[in-house]
């Protein structure tokens, strides 16, 4: 038996789940809903989101409403048995929540009730969590507060970045949807209520929240840089210039200079922090490519006044 499925999502993590649904024999993928086009290249050509590109490549019906409520009637006419969402980016109104026979199942990239919100992967790293994971949950009007259906965890280490963790969680999401799909379309699936006393939040990263504060311990700065990679990328300010920082390493050298002081030693760049110096391993000056300090310092040294 095939079930009529609609999918809501936009970025790469959602595309990997969409691809899995597209290839499942039990799924009749009737339509996809994604965010409106929002990114453009230097020539002002539209850059399609991963989900939109997949839909175009595979001739899948696609909606891109400014507000999901705009297409409530179209969704009602399509009559999905179940709607699956992943990193969609819009609140879903109650009218749409009530449409599918087997409800809306959201794929959330944290171990709920921890880290409700739009940036759970970033904050799992920022908060120093030792593990995170994927939660399949029923969608209700309150953000990420529905009953937990299934969860699976994975470990985080000091080298984990948002980019690497997103890929791991995307693959885990796809695996869980494949394994649990037939359970998701059972009418008696209720799940477990979330413990409201254990709730924490991971709101979207805002402009200027990616600026490094070197008046912090080195371990936190390392964590911060990892959390901001590869989007939006950590920024350090130097003489009024914003320098992107992709990768750092904590040293054993106690910081003797004022936090934020840049030091050059044998074609290496170090920055003092609250406790230990950190080494800058990969950085990017404005309008330049990301470079190692060794390559950068072989040219004109931007760190000498």
UniProtKB/Swiss-Prot annotation:
Keywords: Protein biosynthesis, Transferase. Coiled coil: none annotated. It is an enzyme of class 2 (transferase). Its EC number is 2.1.2.9. One of its GO terms (molecular function) is methionyl-tRNA formyltransferase activity. CDD domains: FMT_core_Met-tRNA-FMT_N, Met_tRNA_FMT_C. (6S)-5,6,7,8-tetrahydrofolate binds at residues 110-113. It catalyses: L-methionyl-tRNA(fMet) + (6R)-10-formyltetrahydrofolate = N-formyl-L-methionyl-tRNA(fMet) + (6S)-5,6,7,8-tetrahydrofolate + H(+). It comes from the Bacteria. One of its GO terms (cellular component) is cytosol. It holds the Pfam family Formyl_trans_C. NCBIfam families: fmt. HAMAP family: Formyl_trans. Attaches a formyl group to the free amino group of methionyl-tRNA(fMet). The formyl group appears to play a dual role in the initiator identity of N-formylmethionyl-tRNA by promoting its recognition by IF2 and preventing the misappropriation of this tRNA by the elongation apparatus. Belongs to the Fmt family. This is Methionyl-tRNA formyltransferase. It comes from Ureaplasma parvum serovar 3 (strain ATCC 700970).
